[in-house]
Amino acid sequence: MRRPRRPGGLGGSGGLRLLLCLLLLSSRPGGCSAVSAHGCLFDRRLCSHLEVCIQDGLFGQCQVGVGQARPLLQVTSPVLQRLQGVLRQLMSQGLSWHDDLTQYVISQEMERIPRLRPPEPRPRDRSGLAPKRPGPAGELLLQDIPTGSAPAAQHRLPQPPVGKGGAGASSSLSPLQAELLPPLLEHLLLPPQPPHPSLSYEPALLQPYLFHQFGSRDGSRVSEGSPGMVSVGPLPKAEAPALFSRTASKGIFGDHPGHSYGDLPGPSPAQLFQDSGLLYLAQELPAPSRARVPRLPEQGSSSRAEDSPEGYEKEGLGDRGEKPASPAVQPDAALQRLAAVLAGYGVELRQLTPEQLSTLLTLLQLLPKGAGRNPGGVVNVGADIKKTMEGPVEGRDTAELPARTSPMPGHPTASPTSSEVQQVPSPVSSEPPKAARPPVTPVLLEKKSPLGQSQPTVAGQPSARPAAEEYGYIVTDQKPLSLAAGVKLLEILAEHVHMSSGSFINISVVGPALTFRIRHNEQNLSLADVTQQAGLVKSELEAQTGLQILQTGVGQREEAAAVLPQTAHSTSPMRSVLLTLVALAGVAGLLVALAVALCVRQHARQQDKERLAALGPEGAHGDTTFEYQDLCRQHMATKSLFNRAEGPPEPSRVSSVSSQFSDAAQASPSSHSSTPSWCEEPAQANMDISTGHMILAYMEDHLRNRDRLAKEWQALCAYQAEPNTCATAQGEGNIKKNRHPDFLPYDHARIKLKVESSPSRSDYINASPIIEHDPRMPAYIATQGPLSHTIADFWQMVWESGCTVIVMLTPLVEDGVKQCDRYWPDEGASLYHVYEVNLVSEHIWCEDFLVRSFYLKNVQTQETRTLTQFHFLSWPAEGTPASTRPLLDFRRKVNKCYRGRSCPIIVHCSDGAGRTGTYILIDMVLNRMAKGVKEIDIAATLEHVRDQRPGLVRSKDQFEFALTAVAEEVNAILKALPQ
């Protein structure tokens, strides 16, 4: 069987096909074409237009005509298991029903299955159709025993033997017979049911566990509602096997050896049922309820005709030689009774053909009196079955459980649609369907009341209320309980009670409860027995399944569901308390989270306010501020006109790269004022290209040679300035004015304040002048961040030195540590000793730095000046900026604003050493390069500035950062030069 699949998917080459045809010729007359195709129930295209699909009990077989009787297959569980294996191999090879190899293998397997010959049809006289009284009906029933095989493929079983005598048998119907006869009438009067759900190869024939899942003893019944099936064809109808299976036949006709069922002449009740069923199916009744039943096109009637046993079409009433009696010949009482029965089904007498009317009258005489008039009795199951047919059709789309358990065909009274009603509640009728298991021998039938109490009822007598089904239930602690866990629990329970797992039917799960019913079993165990045993072996079941069994019992399904709220209600107080506590905890947690979020937001706002205070357009202050600004502008305008009359001042000896290569040496209005310029374009430098490339190559080599850089830094650390005394800074009155005790100004290089103007009557401030080349004019003033008690000294230094630019390289607070005190007003104006500082504007240039403008006024002399503060924010205390680009842009802004006036630039950080020294070193080197100096020695320049203030450029990283910044600025200048 394991052959390579050819591209066409037909399973072999032409040579193999010819060889198989020769093998068929050697074994069968007629060659390959004479072999009937198997599998037409799954693929209708196998049969030609001259052939029909005949039910053979398994797959269906194509045959020309339907008159030829075919042997019946005795299908058992081992046979199905073997066929499953064969089909698996065929499907694994990619073969289909159309392949010759598949047909050959299936035909060989079919030859191995045992066969049963159907009885030869005998001529029947008209007496078999004549209506008889209820008394002799039993006599007719025992005389006319021969029956055809059941129309369902799953029950090709030997027909039961008949009693010894025909006319001498029992003359009255037993209670069991009286209860089993109404389904015959039900099958005739109710409209044809829709085709069964489609079947797939995988679940139907390729799953060995279906026998255990659905409990079919002969392994021939598959689920009618299994989910996930692939449609390959309709199933045969299963109404007749439920009525004429081996158990039902023995119950009705008895088990009497000695006579074959084909020995007695005349029509049997089974034959009447089949013939009348064919007549009814041949002509659809225009009943109102027929429109509710969906039918597939071209399958509603053809499937029933094809699924019925062979020969029934030709063995109808027409073959008996005589026409049935007309309605006029029938007794009036019988017609009235038949009309009353038909009225309950929505059918009128005039809608029936004479053949149908005669057959129904014959069957009606077999019914006990009052059976058709009592819609709620035990015997009359027509109303319940009708509800089961209408319920699932109308409510199928509203509620459908994931898995459904089909009723077993061997059960005598199981309705084909009862499982659907049990699993899918119908919105039309909430009354449970009737599928009760009747006892075989007793005359009294048990009728279940809605309260679960048993009430004995004589068969055939009307009852006051309809019967209700009983279910066994097992309540567990798992909610919801999965269907797989429930089935596993029942399998283990079946082992403990020595039953087959197939004895459990109508299995369903309702929350944590498992409900089920049991079919007739060899142990004769009832639902009460099984649930009682489940309670006895509770510990074993819990150990094997891992579930905790809370309760077991027997009752209606509503009772099993009613147990659930009681269990929940017992724990509801504790659960409500727990839920209340959880809710309170959640609300409290939410409130705490909101409070924390508000605090964090407020703290962030406060930090932003400290960092970027008084944001807004220029002049966004009070009325006093506006008046003061107008006064300052008028004063500055007057001073500007006076300076223009005197002539331009001398150019400064200290200039930046940007100021050196600007368009023109524009004079500032005052030597103590600055004119802000926000041009971002890099200045065009007149640097020699060869010199610039030489300097750039030197700097890059300097940075790549790590050993050289390390040795150079070690030499800088060992350098000692001479002289290096700091006695004044360490004096008793001045030591409190130092922010850091290790970074103090030298005695020979420090800024001295005027004592008469100082509030502390001291000339000391922690600040050092940094001279570039002219000792009389320092280019920078390096100082620490002002303390709260040295702010007045700081503004005195700004006023006396004539500074117009302040470079601040530290935030006020960093990592919770104060780096510098705010020495300018938060908004408006503030007075520090005799110096009034007015914040004019604050402009956030980018995320790395911002610019502030101030008016500085000496209240003693009433003089005013303008100055600009450049505040760089992205330089950590012990490290370096992430990139040199922001600092170089910041430096360009500072030099654009400075305009080269004859005043130093005040540079400060926190301690006035690390960041301050790095900025001064970068700016000084670049200024020298802009002046045309071709020899650049950064280490020597650093030693030069350290001679004037100790500790400038505190770390090796800061020194390397200065080298990198210089190299990048040189590269930028070279790119800006014209090529």
UniProtKB/Swiss-Prot annotation:
PROSITE patterns: TYR_PHOSPHATASE_1, TYR_PHOSPHATASE_2, TYR_PHOSPHATASE_PTP. It is a single-pass type I membrane protein. The chain crosses the membrane at residues 576-600. Its main location: membrane. InterPro entries: IA-2/IA-2_beta, Prot-tyrosine_phosphatase-like, PTP_cat, Receptor_IA-2_dom, Receptor_IA-2_ectodomain_sf, RESP18_dom, Tyr_Pase_AS, Tyr_Pase_cat. It comes from the Eukaryota. N-glycosylated. O-glycosylated with core 1 or possibly core 8 glycans. Plays a role in vesicle-mediated secretory processes. Required for normal accumulation of secretory vesicles in hippocampus, pituitary and pancreatic islets. Required for the accumulation of normal levels of insulin-containing vesicles and preventing their degradation. Plays a role in insulin secretion in response to glucose stimuli. Required for normal accumulation of the neurotransmitters norepinephrine, dopamine and serotonin in the brain. Homodimer; shown for the unprocessed protein (proICA512) in the endoplasmic reticulum and resolved during protein maturation as ICA512-TMF seems to be predominantly monomeric in secretory granules; however, ICA512-CCF interacts with ICA512-TMF disrupting the ICA512-TMF:SNTB2 complex. The isolated lumenal RESP18 homology domain has been shown to form disulfide-linked homooligomers. Interacts (via cytoplasmic domain) with phosphorylated SNTB2; this protects PTPRN against cleavage by CAPN1 to produce ICA512-CCF. The RESP18 homology domain is sufficient for targeting proICA512 to secretory granules. This is Receptor-type tyrosine-protein phosphatase-like N. It comes from Homo sapiens. The gene is PTPRN.
